[in-house]
Amino acid sequence: MMNDGPNAIAVDQLVIDRLGTRVLPGISLSIPTAMITGLLGPSGSGKTTLLRAIMGVQIITSGSVTVLGLPAGHRDLRSTVGYVTQAPAVYLDLSVRENLRYFAAIAGAPVGRVDEVIEVVDLGELRDRRVDQLSGGQRSRVSLATALLGRPQLLVLDEPTVGLDPVLRRDLWALFHNLAAEGATLLVSSHVMQEAQHCDTLLLLREGVLLFAGTPTQLQARTHSDDLDEAFLSIVEQQEG
């Protein structure tokens, strides 16, 4: 299913060089609103660099990135965009609740929002536990909760399901779909092609090159394959051929 409304993100001829290496060679793409877009590709394909550019924290060589109608990194986006990095960005020596109260104060979110997001990410029984006593998956959910404090219009998530067991992964995708149903836009990166089945639209990236943009159904139709790993390999072979 594609969204005919305005795009949440527009990337135009984006070029990024890092340490003398061209990571993104002039990529252009758009991401629709109120949907889940999967940014998929192997490690080292440029996914995190692209996400950093969208967040406005990556130096770009040329091109442009527009987010919710504003230049990436614009100060007015701070309250409308949530970013969850692959490494949990929370304080290990504070409890779940203490972390969220701290970040709520920074975001200007009401105190009552803290307990709301704790329940949303299913950490109610662990709210008073120190983060250094949590599992990796639980720490990731604390990071997600901090990003949800301001009720963001756009949520950017870098490999959020890495290291999670199947049950937690299922529950997290259910949460993502609920957020999209409420009008949020989600951009989710992963190196696991099977995650594509949970997304409304897909962006397949390899070595900084956008190989495919469309729905999972369109990907399967183009490659004549129901297996997502095989579909990705087919797209790569088509590109190289």
For each feature predicted by the language model, list its residue ranges:
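Helix-to-loop junction immediately C-terminal to a conserved catalytic motif
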Residues: 55
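Conserved ABC ATPase signature
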Residues: 130-134
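Conserved ABC transporter NBD signature motif
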Residues: 62-73, 77-79
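Catalytic Walker B motif of ABC-type/P-loop ATPase nucleotide-binding domains
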Residues: 155-159
